[in-house]
């Protein structure tokens, strides 16, 4: 969400920088119904919405992102995969991606993500856990 649309104190409340209702309405509902859809992703780096992305119906739709596992969206998925790696690997990847912005990113976003994972038991509620560093998959439910 653009800053003007975020709730007060969003930096202390996991997932309040996301518009889950819009994600459901614009992406998840049409995808599950086998209909074409398009969406606008907000770029914090750019401070603006990116150009629209159009998607055609498909048998497999992958919704990626930390907050895509929010319990409010659980009924939209047939399979939930939690992708993880070690803290050292996370740091290495984020430093490569964020460059000079890494310290600010680590201070703001990592605690929010970790709080979200803990509050909603994201890893524990996944059907599969993929260790991206080791290339291993673990089924969490029978």
Outline where the language-model segments fall.
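Acidic, metal/cofactor-coordinating or nucleic-acid-engaging core segments within structured domains
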Residues: 106-109
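ATP-dependent NMP and nucleoside kinases share a basic, alpha-helical "lid"
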Residues: 46-97
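Conserved nucleotide-sensing/catalytic segment adjacent to the nucleotide-binding pocket
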Residues: 1-54, 60-61
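Flexible, active-site-adjacent loop/turn segments at secondary-structure boundaries
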Residues: 8, 40, 71, 114-115
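Short, surface-exposed, charge-dense and proline/glycine-enriched linear segments
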Residues: 20-24, 62-75, 134-142
């Amino acid at each position: 969400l653009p800053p003007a649309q975020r709730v007060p104190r969003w930096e202390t409340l996991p997932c309040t920088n996301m518009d889950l209702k819009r994600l459901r309405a614009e992406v998840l509902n049409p995808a599950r119904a086998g209909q074409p859809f398009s969406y606008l992703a907000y770029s914090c780096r750019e401070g603006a919405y990116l150009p629209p992305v159009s998607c055609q119906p498909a048998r497999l739709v992958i919704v990626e992102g930390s907050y895509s596992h929010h319990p409010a969206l659980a009924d939209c998925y047939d399979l939930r995969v939690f992708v993880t790696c070690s803290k050292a690997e996370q740091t290495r990847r984020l430093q490569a991606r964020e460059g000079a912005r890494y310290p600010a990113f680590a201070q703001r976003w990592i605690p929010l993500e970790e709080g979200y994972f803990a509050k909603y038991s994201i890893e524990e509620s996944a059907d599969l856990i993929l260790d991206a560093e080791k290339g291993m998959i673990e089924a969490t439910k029978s």
